[in-house]
């Protein structure tokens, strides 16, 4: 099959006790195809591998729940969802604690600072916070309320409905 996705039945025979890491994209920037990250994660972890997900293309279209996916690491960039050019990385605490950090000896060993190689880009972090505030505003404008997670769900629902309406015209 040429689905341009990672097919579970084709991946499974490739996983074994020598597999250390499965790195996959959540969505393709070329085809728009979306991988079943939750199923692929379970399969890889069942073989003893860690899972890294590149969600750059997906994060602008759908809300991500890393706990539901079960992945060990996930990365995206806010520039894909109206924010600044900044890398955002999620990692399970036990995985992050087990990784060696390449840093100066005087730098903190505490998470998340142990992976910072210099002064944080405060202006980019402020831009990211502005993006998140925009999402909350958008949710409120479309009649959504609730806690922060519910506001993000509402914002993504509104953006998805708008994308769908635009796509219908194609």
Positions of predicted regions on the chain:
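Pyridoxal 5′-phosphate
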Residues: 1-170
């Amino acid at each position: 099959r040429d689905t341009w996705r990672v097919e579970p039945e084709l991946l499974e025979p490739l996983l074994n006790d020598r597999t250390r890491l499965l790195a996959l994209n959540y969505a393709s920037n070329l085809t728009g195809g979306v991988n079943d990250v939750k199923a692929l994660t379970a399969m890889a972890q069942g073989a003893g591998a860690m899972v890294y997900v590149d969600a750059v293309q997906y994060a602008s279209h759908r809300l991500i729940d890393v706990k539901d996916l079960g992945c060990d690491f996930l990365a995206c960039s806010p520039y894909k969802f109206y924010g600044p050019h900044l890398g955002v990385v999620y990692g399970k605490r036990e995985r992050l604690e087990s990784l060696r950090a390449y840093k100066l000896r005087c730098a903190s060993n505490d998470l998340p600072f142990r992976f910072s190689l210099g002064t944080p880009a405060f202006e980019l972090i402020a831009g990211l916070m502005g993006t998140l505030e925009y999402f909350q505003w958008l949710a409120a404008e479309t009649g959504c309320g609730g806690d922060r997670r519910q506001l993000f769900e509402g914002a993504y629902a509104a953006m998805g409905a708008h994308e769908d309406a635009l796509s219908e015209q194609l």
